């Protein structure tokens, strides 16, 4: 082997090591802070799944999670339940109402008189609002609540219309259906979606999914599991009863071990904890 070939092999080996090291996301004090994702918006300070709740998150630099349902005439709306009973001044199923009929619903007074006449927003309106904050690096998690074989393409079309497809992450139980994932991927290969894992056994299956770029865990994963997710080039999004409440110890664990995003009802409190963590570094 001549000197030139030897030199090239050394350089190549150095580059391989550098790439492998770069793929290992740091943990502990060097771990970047996770993104805050407000559950249905700033849920403790404004009515869930409304523009007021989402705007509050955007102003604070938080991401948010939103739910997707459809009206009788096919419009995509932001609503968690299948009925309007809990979060408006009327009763009934959303699928029995047209988009026009939803306009008069009061989706804010149930929470506080200050939010009287907040409406059930259309997904088009929500995406437009996100687009109005182009400098935000937050994550906007889309939880598809229906499975009608057309919703995935419709969502991608709206996201691309507003130029925010790369800022959305598709999550939830519906996305566990392989056909839903395939339709999202067919709509646009740049779609970011997460496979759900409720425990360590499911994490193995979720990591093996070739179409997903994130793992959506609903338990507190071990440091080794978090490292494994990152080693495979994916990111980890945590939700569920380990982080949804005001759970400072679990939040601190996620911060220390490099979880990428935390979905919580207590976005403001988590924000304060992240600021303290950043200041202490």
Regions found by a protein language model. Name each.
Residues 7-17:
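Bacterial N-terminal signal peptides
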Residues 23-44, 115-118:
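Long, acidic (Asp/Glu-rich), low-complexity accessory segments flanking structured domains
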Residues 28-30, 127-135, 156-163, 181-188, ...:
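Acidic (Asp/Glu)-rich catalytic clusters
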Residues 36-38, 64-66, 140-142, 168-172, ...:
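Hydrophobic faces of well-ordered beta-strands that scaffold small-molecule active sites
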Residues 39, 57, 67, 102, ...:
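Conserved, mostly hydrophobic/aromatic
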Residues 53-70, 209-215:
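Catalytic domains of carbohydrate-active enzymes, especially glycoside hydrolases
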Residues 80-190:
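Metal-dependent phosphodiesterase/phospholipase catalytic core, i.e.
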Residues 192-281:
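C-terminal active-site rim and adjoining tail of enzyme catalytic domains
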């Amino acid at each position: 082997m001549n000197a030139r070939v030897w030199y090239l092999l050394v350089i190549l080996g150095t580059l391989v090591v550098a790439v492998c090291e770069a793929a290992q996301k740091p943990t502990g004090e060097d771990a970047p802070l996770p993104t805050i994702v407000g559950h249905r918006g700033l849920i403790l300070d404004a009515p869930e799944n409304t523009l007021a709740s989402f705007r509050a998150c955007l102003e604070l630099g938080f991401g948010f999670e939103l739910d997707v349902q459809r009206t009788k005439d096919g419009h995509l709306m932001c609503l968690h339940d299948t009925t309007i009973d809990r979060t408006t001044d009327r009763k009934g199923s959303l699928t029995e109402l047209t988009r026009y009929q939803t306009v008069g619903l009061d989706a804010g007074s149930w929470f506080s008189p200050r939010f009287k006449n907040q409406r059930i927003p259309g997904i088009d309106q929500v995406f437009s609002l996100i687009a109005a904050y182009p400098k935000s690096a937050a994550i906007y998690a889309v939880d598809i609540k229906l499975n009608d074989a057309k919703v995935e393409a419709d969502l991608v079309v709206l996201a691309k219309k507003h130029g925010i497809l790369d800022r959305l992450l598709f999550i939830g139980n519906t996305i566990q259906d392989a056909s839903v994932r395939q339709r999202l991927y067919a709509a646009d290969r740049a779609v970011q979606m997460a496979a759900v894992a409720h425990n360590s056994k499911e994490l193995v299956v979720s990591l093996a999914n070739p179409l997903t770029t994130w793992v959506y865990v609903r338990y507190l994963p071990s440091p080794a599991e978090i490292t494994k997710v990152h080693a495979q080039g994916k990111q980890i999004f945590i939700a569920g009863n380990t982080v949804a409440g005001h759970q400072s110890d679990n939040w601190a664990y996620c911060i220390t071990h490099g979880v990428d995003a935390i979905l919580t009802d207590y976005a403001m409190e988590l924000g304060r904890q992240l600021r303290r963590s950043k200041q202490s570094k």
